[in-house]
């Protein structure tokens, strides 16, 4: 009888803890959702970190138009002199298309000249900015119509938010 009572108390405490944890995480999610604006990712001047800023961006039209609006924003020089655009000024975007849940971006050949660190920050900033759009889960990159390759010469493929490891991608 005593064992059964202890077991019931233990199960009740466990259920209560689960309920409390579930409520807390929901509240944290709601708090983050209360920040108004669209998340635009920039980098610091040393190009070592991604920095997210919420901005009021007028996203109108179909998915393709929204993607183009966000890409233009990622190319613009920010007002603050402490951050930079993730897409360097000298990099041109040849084309953009949206196919189901994947955005395909084709860069000019100038993209091949950016440093490895700048490349990582650029791709991560683009992926994090575009995948906040409804039904966009991945971004695929190419250079002058050819698939983008990693340092080993392997095609990078479509990248999602989970493609970047936070230990390797500093964020602020």
Protein language model features and the residues they cover:
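Bimodal "functional hotspot" detector
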Residues: 2-13, 17, 21-172
């Amino acid at each position: 009888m005593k064992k059964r009572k202890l077991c019931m108390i233990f199960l009740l405490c466990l259920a209560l803890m689960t309920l409390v944890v579930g409520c807390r995480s929901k509240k944290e999610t709601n708090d983050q959702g209360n920040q108004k604006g669209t998340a635009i990712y920039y980098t610091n001047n040393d190009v070592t970190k991604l920095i997210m800023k919420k901005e009021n961006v007028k996203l109108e039209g179909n998915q393709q138009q929204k993607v183009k609006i966000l890409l233009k924003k990622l190319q613009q020089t920010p007002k603050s002199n402490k951050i930079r655009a993730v897409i360097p000024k000298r990099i041109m975007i040849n084309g953009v298309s949206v196919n189901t849940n994947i955005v395909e971006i084709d860069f000019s050949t100038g993209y091949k000249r950016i440093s490895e660190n700048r490349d990582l920050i650029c791709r991560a900033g683009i992926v994090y900015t575009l995948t906040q759009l409804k039904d966009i889960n991945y971004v695929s990159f190419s250079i002058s119509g050819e698939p983008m390759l990693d340092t080993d010469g392997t095609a990078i493929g479509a990248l999602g938010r989970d493609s970047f490891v936070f230990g390797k991608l500093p964020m602020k």
